[in-house]
UniProtKB/Swiss-Prot annotation:
Cellular localisation: Cytoplasm
Binding site for Zn(2+) 2: 98, 101, 104, 112
Residues given in the record as Zn(2+) 1 binding sites: 44, 67, 154
Catalytic activity, as annotated: a primary alcohol + NAD(+) = an aldehyde + NADH + H(+); a secondary alcohol + NAD(+) = a ketone + NADH + H(+)
Enzyme nomenclature, EC number: 1.1.1.1
Family membership: Belongs to the zinc-containing alcohol dehydrogenase family.
Keyword Transferase among UniProt keywords: no
Annotated protein name in UniProt: Alcohol dehydrogenase 2
PROSITE patterns: ADH_ZINC
Cross-referenced InterPro entries: ADH-like_C, ADH-like_N, ADH_Zn_CS, GroES-like_sf, NAD(P)-bd_dom_sf, PKS_ER
Signal peptide: none
Gene3D superfamilies for the chain: Medium-chain alcohol dehydrogenases, catalytic domain, NAD(P)-binding Rossmann-like Domain
């Protein structure tokens, strides 16, 4: 298979600097890496943070962002086993880890102190060819729609892991704060497929419509509700058993600690800048409420999340645009205009 020396990609040289769509070199895979011809990549809010550089973890510079890349294996390093040229493969947020620390040994590779992150510390999927550690790369079944599966590689895995972290059982109520964005729209579907009753919190008629189309049961418009906490407690007959916070609102996180029911779990996923999780200690203790953080999933979570997709139980409401339009997608993110998930086609 002929691999070019150069490719199209979007790169920036300083945080917040110009997003340049240009010719850049095709990377060479290391001994443990795959070279993947990326066909499509989802666009995540994390990509926006990587570009802005507003998280306490520094990015590499210059940087090619992106960590939801779906494509085809075109080359591999000499130490790679279990992969073949032509296999479908996915680039995830966790590009690689040491595999020898206590976290990796317990399958918590994302907590590895030496974790290598796609589109953050490792050039990511906003290019036509990208490298990924062969151990961490996602195995995508042949015949899969690569545009549709791209958001599952981060957004899908992330919310699936968060739902598992809530420790719910079939028939329980789960409230999803930020229900109709890229993460929330998938969380609704995973929750339904896992047997939960779904309450969504977001705003606007378009998002309310999407929520119902995806199988949600009760929608709360936070901009309209006169008493959001009471409305949720009443709708769920005592409060949600679990709350998945994918919104990036500190106030929304604080509210969630008040509408979760006794013995329930509040799961933190979204990462508002400089935010604190505020909870009344007396209430939290008396209600025996758990507040947990949920980061990206491990390899087993990825396999399971992809299986839900392969069986047709979840799909990403996507809008496909060219990679050259990435700056416009970021602008929509900043303005809060994203419904569902944007996916970039690297050929355009």
């Amino acid at each position: 298979m002929s691999i070019p020396e150069t490719q199209k990609g979007v790169i920036f040289y300083e945080n917040g600097g110009e997003l340049q769509y240009k010719d850049i070199p095709v990377p060479k895979p290391k001994a443990n890496e795959l070279l993947i011809n990326v066909k499509y990549s989802g666009v995540c809010h994390t990509d926006l943070h990587a570009w802005k550089g507003d998280w306490p973890l520094p990015t590499k510079l210059p940087l090619v962002g992106g960590h939801e890349g779906a494509g085809v294996v075109v080359a591999m390093g000499e130490n790679v086993k279990g992969w073949n040229i032509g296999d479908f493969a996915g680039i995830k947020w966790l590009n690689g880890s040491c595999m020898s620390c206590e976290y990796c040994e317990l399958s918590n590779e994302s907590n590895c102190p030496d974790a290598d992150l796609s589109g953050y510390t490792h050039d990511g999927s906003f290019q036509q060819y990208a490298t990924a550690d062969a151990v961490q790369a996602a195995r995508i079944p042949k015949g899969t729609d690569l545009a549709e599966v791209a958001p599952i590689l981060c957004a899908g895995v992330t919310v699936y892991k968060a739902l598992k972290s809530a420790d719910l059982k079939a028939g329980d109520w789960v409230a999803i704060s930020g229900a109709c964005g890229g993460l929330g729209s998938l969380a609704i579907q995973y929750a339904k497929a896992m047997g939960y009753r779904v309450l969504g919190i977001d705003t606007g008629a378009e998002k309310a419509k999407l929520f119902k189309e995806l199988g949600g049961e009760y929608f709360v418009d936070y901009a309209v509700s006169k008493d959001l906490i009471k409305e949720i407690v009443d709708a769920t007959n005592g409060g949600a058993h679990g709350v998945i916070n994918v919104s990036v609102s500190e106030f929304a996180i604080e509210q969630s600690t008040n509408y979760v029911r006794s013995n329930g779990t509040v799961v933190l996923v979204g990462l508002p800048r400089d935010a604190k999780c505020k909870s009344d200690v007396f209430t939290q203790v008396v209600k025996s409420v758990s507040i947990v953080g949920s980061y990206v999933g491990n390899r087993a979570d990825t396999r399971e999340a992809l299986d839900f997709f392969a069986r047709g139980l979840v799909h990403a409401p996507i809008k496909i645009v060219g990679l050259s339009e990435l700056a416009d997608v970021y602008d929509k993110m900043v303005k809060g205009e994203i419904v569902g998930r944007y996916v970039v086609d690297t050929s355009k």
